[in-house]
Regions:
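Terminal helices and disordered tails flanking the catalytic cores of nucleotide-processing hydrolases
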Residues: 1-4, 234-262
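Conserved alpha-helical "signature site"
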Residues: 1-157, 161-164, 168-230, 262
Length: 262
């Protein structure tokens, strides 16, 4: 398996020109909308997606949106930041090569995790934008595995859903030679993205890592429309429950956004 893993690292896709810089700047909490518009216009594909989204039933504009500036204004800073980061990364992969991979579910839970991390971050003394970006990118390795190893990825999903199967991480290591977090770290390293932005390599007990893990678990529970597991709650149960309830109310809208974008 390790030989296969080493071979696969040679197939890591490159980011679109300017995508790495776009990620760094848009993830900065101090970036304003004018600068985001400038960055988005560097990438015609991202600009087109934002325009399409701003003109969709999801956005429900009163009149046609015809400029990137108006599209960003219509969608709002948080939506533009999240979708631009997701598109900058996501366009490097074709997860449809793996029919078992549910792209809508992946992006919906990733966006929910990003929103949750942003809400939880202040309680841990972590910058909300940094936490949101790290949570959004946490499982990006899944896209790479679905694109580059579709058959192995399908086998991992079959393993994880079997009655006597293991958890997904174990099944991914068995079928693909690495789990989703290891795959993500390989991408971050190859793309030279800073650890502060991705959460990769962070101490498992660090505030940022804890936020990412809790946000991911909560996002999965929200997507499944289940009650918040007590084990998921941090020290302040009431605050965590409040965040969970708030973001749960965004599920339908987030599902629609993920379907439009991906």
């Amino acid at each position: 398996m390790m030989t296969a893993t080493a071979t696969r690292t040679n197939r890591i896709p490159t980011l679109e020109n300017g995508a790495a810089q776009l990620l760094l700047e848009i993830a900065d909490g101090d970036v304003d909308m004018d600068r985001i518009v400038q960055l988005v216009q560097i990438s015609p594909s991202i600009a087109a997606k934002l325009l399409s989204t701003a003109n969709s039933a999801w956005s429900n504009p009163v009149r046609p949106v015809t400029s990137v500036t108006d599209a960003c204004s219509r969608l709002g800073l948080n939506v533009v930041r999240t979708t631009t980061i997701a598109l900058a990364i996501g366009q490097s992969f074709d997860p449809k090569r793996c029919p078992a991979f549910d792209a809508e579910r992946f992006w919906c839970t990733s966006i929910l995790a990003s929103r949750l991390a942003s809400e939880l971050a202040p309680r841990f003394g972590v910058d909300p934008n940094t936490a949101a970006t790290a949570a959004l990118l946490n499982n990006i390795g899944m896209l790479w595995l679905a694109d580059s190893m579709p058959e192995a990825m399908s086998a991992a999903f079959d393993c994880a859903t079997a009655d006597d199967g293991g958890n997904l991480s174990e099944c991914l290591r068995e079928s693909c030679g690495m789990d989703r977090r290891e795959a993500s770290q390989l991408l971050f390293s190859a793309w030279r993205l800073p650890e502060a932005l991705t959460g990769a390599g962070a101490d498992p007990q660090s505030p940022q890592r804890l936020i990412i893990d809790v946000a991911e678990t909560m996002a999965t529970e929200i997507y499944a429309e289940t009650a918040l597991d007590d084990a998921t709650c941090a020290e302040d149960d009431n605050a965590t429950t409040t965040v969970y309830t708030k973001i749960s109310g965004e599920l339908e809208k987030t599902q629609e956004l993920a379907a439009i974008l991906f």
